[in-house]
From Swiss-Prot:
The keyword Membrane applies. This is UPF0715 membrane protein YwlA. It is a multi-pass membrane protein. It comes from Bacillus subtilis (strain 168). It is found in: Cell membrane.
Amino acid sequence: MKYNYTVLLSAFTMSVLYSVIYIHSFIIAALITMAFYFLFPYLIFALPLQIMMNKKPKRFSPLYLLYYLAAAFIANAIIFGMLQPSGQSLFQNTAFYLFAVLTALIYWIWDSVLLQKKEA
């Protein structure tokens, strides 16, 4: 059940950050829409990785952050590759890097707070 909280809280946190960065206000419809937008990539990419890493739980592990960053860059490359115009380079888009780092960092923080145990 805590896996669900991690995914939901991460998606909601990212929707709030998206609203602050791009919309510059809190519009309920935008928060809900963006939460769903962030929810599905988290379910597809981060949740399986989280379940695998929870076999050896470590709170705020830099290695786990690197794993989440790798998954976030792959997920964002797929999503940005589908959504951006064909003439634009993916690696010149600052939003690509911003969202890859933010999605990984937010998920890592919620994962560490809710699920990971202190390292013995």
